[in-house]
């Protein structure tokens, strides 16, 4: 029981001494704020100007919303001023030279963000202020600001944006509060490095290139007094890897697909389908672009220009493809090829485009040697052994007589005896026998045609010798000749028809090859001219966030140590 009582007394004494551990600070707080009015500007004379120094320490660049044109930042708003009512002698208060007090208990300058975009113009988290015995007050509250930032999408996604944050007193004019930058000199209102980046966390989307600040003194038409403000500028350069991989490379690939349309054969029937598919793909990219950039009419973004250029190429390729297909399926029935078209697209352009048309294979007129199995040596005067009947019949019907050499070939091919054609011709003065039926037999023809002779020769001789047999045989022969002529003419017309169709197809192929080269050159040149006009591609300046940020330096040192340990 005694030990428990001792412990309770010890704890009570400990808390009692702890509560009175800093009586000087409590006494100082009571003395400073007992008669303090936080609503009155802390100056000895109402005409005196109170100098307020302000700075900005950037912690994070949270977001740059292109579509809504809002920049979200996490900053510390550093403010300093002198309050003559908050001075004391440290010797009178046990050597206490600084005091932390709630900011709600002292006078604060009403500094707000002019270009605010979400309704909170001032600091929302009221942290404590630090009071120095000289009367100096330091207040560094954190804040998350959403400020309006005019987005310039001309070179998107290879763009640089300059956003600003404008701070100033909302009610006090320049005669009451003299607003200055923490690093400002007496002879200049411009500060080269106006934002402190020591505690900045590197952004994965933006590089900070410049952070100047400028102090402005403006006169408005409503008032005679000047109003002071400080503008903090942030020049941001986009890291383009994300948009290059997800937008630029797919767009370039789709644009070059329009070139392959002309390499696709016209007979495949897929040329128009490929063009329409490319147009639909470009439409999807247009929708993605419209979701990213603000709906501005001031300028067309770089990626939008490239998509428009690609869409024009694809649309033109559709028109050209339709024309090429029209040429490919032309025929002699509907179109006649002009001489200049034949000369230009069949003779001249193929040589320039390195197109070689396969030559047509001519049919071999000579028979193969194995056909002439029964004929070894033809006499040089074989043409004189021509049947009289063939001469006369050919003269009557305009059919050329079969040369003797061909007769020997026919005999060899058909297994007909060669001596069937080797008989001497009948004399023209040979008397015609009567209409006796016995005379039409092969043996009755004066023995000139042997039984082993070909039937055609026997029939020809019989027709020549017999007037009765001549007329019906001539009529049948005439019908046969007319049929043969019709078939031959039909085959000839068909070959000519197919030849003209092949010429049109060849012209279409030449057009395809010509437009393939034209569109390939247009795609390469257009891509280079549009993409390479972005100034940031040639800007070799290094971002300053890596130079000033202690967090970034520490991170790089850790990465370097890790890589060295790995090696």
Curated annotation (Swiss-Prot):
Extracellular side: 22-240
Protein name per UniProt: Acetylcholine receptor subunit alpha-like 1
Primary localisation category: membrane
Cytoplasmic side: 326-513
Glycosylation sites: 45, 233
Membrane topology annotation: Multi-pass membrane protein
PANTHER family assigned to the protein according to its UniProt record, in alphabetical order: NEUROTRANSMITTER GATED ION CHANNEL
CDD domains recorded: LGIC_ECD_nAChR_proto_alpha-like, LGIC_TM_nAChR
UniProt keyword Calcium present: no
Compartments it resides in: Postsynaptic cell membrane; Cell membrane
One Gene Ontology term of the molecular function aspect: transmembrane signaling receptor activity
Cleaved signal peptide residues: 1-21
GO biological process: chemical synaptic transmission; monoatomic cation transmembrane transport; monoatomic ion transmembrane transport; regulation of membrane potential; response to insecticide; synaptic transmission, cholinergic
GO cellular component: acetylcholine-gated channel complex; neuron projection; plasma membrane; postsynaptic membrane; synapse
Superkingdom classification of source: Eukaryota
Functional summary from the UniProt entry: After binding acetylcholine, the AChR responds by an extensive change in conformation that affects all subunits and leads to opening of an ion-conducting channel across the plasma membrane.
SS bond partners: 149-163, 222-223
InterPro entries the record matches: Neur_chan_lig-bd (IPR006202), Neur_chan_lig-bd_sf (IPR036734), Neur_channel (IPR006201), Neuro-gated_channel_TM_sf (IPR036719), Neuro_actylchol_rec (IPR038050), Neurotrans-gated_channel_TM (IPR006029), Neurotransmitter_ion_chnl_CS (IPR018000), Nicotinic_acetylcholine_rcpt (IPR002394)
SUPFAM superfamilies: Neurotransmitter-gated ion-channel transmembrane pore, Nicotinic receptor ligand binding domain-like
Keywords: Cell membrane, Disulfide bond, Glycoprotein, Ion channel, Ion transport, Ligand-gated ion channel, Membrane, Postsynaptic cell membrane, Receptor, Signal, Synapse, Transmembrane, Transmembrane helix, Transport
Membrane-spanning segments: 241-264, 272-290, 306-325, 514-532
Free-text tissue specificity from the UniProt record: CNS in embryos.
Family: Belongs to the ligand-gated ion channel (TC 1.A.9) family. Acetylcholine receptor (TC 1.A.9.1) subfamily.
């Amino acid at each position: 029981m005694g030990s428990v009582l001792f412990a309770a007394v010890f704890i009570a004494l400990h808390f009692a001494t702890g509560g009175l551990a800093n009586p000087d600070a409590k006494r100082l707080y009571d003395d400073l704020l007992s008669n303090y009015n936080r609503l009155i500007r802390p100056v000895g004379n109402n005409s005196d100007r109170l100098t307020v120094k302000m700075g900005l320490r950037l912690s994070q660049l949270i977001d740059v919303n292109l579509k809504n044109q809002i920049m979200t930042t996490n900053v510390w708003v550093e403010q300093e001023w002198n309050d003559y009512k908050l001075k004391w002698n440290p010797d009178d208060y046990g050597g206490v030279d600084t005091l932390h007090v709630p900011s709600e208990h002292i006078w604060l300058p009403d500094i707000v963000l002019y270009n605010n975009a979400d309704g909170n113009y001032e600091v929302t988290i009221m942290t404590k202020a630090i009071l120095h015995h000289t009367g100096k007050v330091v207040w560094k509250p954190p804040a998350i600001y959403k400020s309006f930032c005019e987005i310039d999408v001309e070179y998107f996604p290879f763009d640089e944006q300059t956003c600003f944050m404008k701070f100033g007193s909302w009610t006090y004019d320049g005669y009451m509060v003299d607003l200055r930058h923490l690093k400002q000199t007496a002879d200049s209102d411009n500060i080269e490095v106006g934002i402190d980046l020591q505690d900045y966390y590197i952004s994965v989307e933006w590089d900070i290139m410049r952070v100047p600040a400028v102090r402005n003194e403006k006169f408005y038409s409503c008032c005679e007094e000047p109003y002071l403000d400080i503008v903090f500028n942030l020049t941001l350069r986009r890291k383009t890897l994300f948009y290059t991989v997800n937008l630029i490379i797919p767009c370039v690939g789709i644009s070059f697909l329009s070139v392959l349309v002309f390499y696709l054969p016209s007979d495949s029937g897929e040329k128009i389908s490929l063009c329409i598919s490319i147009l639909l793909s470009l439409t999807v990219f247009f929708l993605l672009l419209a979701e990213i950039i603000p709906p501005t009419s001031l300028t067309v973004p770089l990626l939008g220009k490239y998509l428009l250029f690609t869409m024009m190429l694809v649309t033109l390729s559709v028109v050209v493809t339709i024309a090429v297909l029209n040429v490919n399926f032309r025929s002699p029935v509907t179109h006649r090829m002009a001489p200049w078209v034949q000369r230009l697209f069949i003779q001249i352009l193929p040589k320039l485009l390195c197109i070689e048309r396969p030559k047509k294979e001519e049919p071999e007129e000579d028979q193969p040697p194995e056909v002439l199995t029964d004929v070894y040596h033809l006499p040089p005067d074989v043409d004189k052994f021509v049947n009289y009947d063939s001469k006369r019949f050919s003269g009557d019907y305009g059919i050329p007589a079969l040369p003797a050499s061909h007769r020997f070939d026919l005999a060899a091919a058909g297994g007909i005896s060669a001596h069937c054609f080797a008989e001497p011709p009948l004399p023209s003065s040979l008397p015609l026998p009567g209409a006796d039926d016995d005379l039409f037999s092969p043996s009755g023809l004066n023995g000139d045609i042997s039984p082993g002779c070909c039937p055609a020769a026997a029939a020809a001789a019989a027709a020549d010798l017999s007037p009765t047999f001549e007329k019906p045989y001539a009529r049948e022969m005439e019908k046969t000749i007319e049929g043969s002529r019709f078939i031959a003419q039909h085959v000839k017309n068909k070959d000519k028809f197919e030849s003209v169709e092949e010429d049109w197809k060849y012209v279409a192929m030449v057009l395809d090859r010509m437009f393939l080269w034209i569109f390939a050159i247009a795609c390469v040149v257009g891509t280079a001219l549009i993409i390479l006009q972005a100034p940031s591609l040639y800007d070799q300046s290094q971002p300053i966030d890596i130079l000033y940020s202690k967090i970034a330096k520490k991170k790089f040192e850790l990465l370097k140590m890790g890589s060295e340990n790995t090696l």
